[in-house]
């Protein structure tokens, strides 16, 4: 029998990547394709779900061709995806009735604000582990049903289906035969009770969302169905592992013990701590969520979501034209002569954890006549580290666990300047994953375990290795001074946006 491989579909916010892994966890092929971002109004972010599906088809076929691997050589497919992004489609035609509303989008702020005003915050936090925010899928579904004529009635008749991107891709791969999600993606909808692991009827009734729209919720590692040959180059391949991108990265880093933490620097930055089999309720605006579910065992997590991280570097490149490429930011930061006096608060779509302020907007502080482009680039890079410290400090306070090491992955973790500054600012060791594509690796691990490609967690430990490590070098007094400046900058940004003090 010829060697078998695993295909991981890593569907992100700005691009789709397909990675083919072998048994040793090595990448045999990796192909990425960007798709269009739509900004119909200020603060709105949308995707075309069919464009995402087309990107998956193109990258899959290219990966298979480049590696000379046939569909029948794929043992299994794993999927990981941008979370919360919401698609509603016609059950019969399979066509979306509205563009996908992206997790970053603020077009549903009014719905979230009304829920807060009507005093539903505590009920929703207790059931879902989440704060009320336009970030999550629930308000996005409600917005679509409100703004498309006849959509509410059609939903009540069972004519419309909802899914996050994982659900949409499984639906397409199986040619409409399977409508499922996994518990990590479900836990990001603001509709899922993370304690009894079911869609919460009280919240569904509150938002008038028919239960018939919602997918069946499965574990992260089981066979959900198989590809339809028409949709997958003539092959029938089991789809058997699925997780939201940040939970997939947690699993890809094998952060499987309570207290283990990872940070993924991508479009946003997402710090996730494994808290074990009991959920920890945050007192400081972190999210209590599901880390992963294997069989009947659920592992919970605390998460701090930063909305703008790598996308701040893209802003420097694409909008203000200070960079030709993102990797140039490292050398620019090293050449900066300023004494870390400039602060960039990249609240382009509001502030995430622990502030949850959707009205805040980006700002720059500390400029002088001598400030240069390199100073601005360095300050933007540093903003990723400052926002991470906001979350790590809060996470330690909520959990009572001192975090000795932060494991990192994602595109921006290639930047050595960023990781050294992160270590300095936290006063903690930073370990970079040897394979930065830990989201795809996590999806592959989950899928492989489901079909016996790998037997158990022990067999994965030789694959998930760490690469370079960064130890803190900064004096504590300097660390505290810099962070105090960041806190003043964030406060000033919020005061400006709201016209009041905090």
UniProtKB/Swiss-Prot annotation:
Reactions catalysed, semicolon-separated, are:
glycerol + ATP = sn-glycerol 3-phosphate + ADP + H(+)
In which residues is glycerol bound?
83-84, 135, 245-246
Activity regulation details: Activated by phosphorylation and inhibited by fructose 1,6-bisphosphate (FBP).
Q: Which GO terms describe its cellular component?
A: cytosol
EC main class here is transferase
Question: The organism sits in which domain of life?
Answer: Bacteria
Q: Which PANTHER family match?
A: GLYCEROL KINASE, SUGAR KINASE
The family classification in the record reads: Belongs to the FGGY kinase family.
Task: Name the chain's protein.
Answer: Glycerol kinase
* Record organism: Lactobacillus delbrueckii subsp. bulgaricus (strain ATCC BAA-365 / Lb-18)
Q: What is the lineage of its organism?
A: Bacteria, Bacillati, Bacillota, Bacilli, Lactobacillales
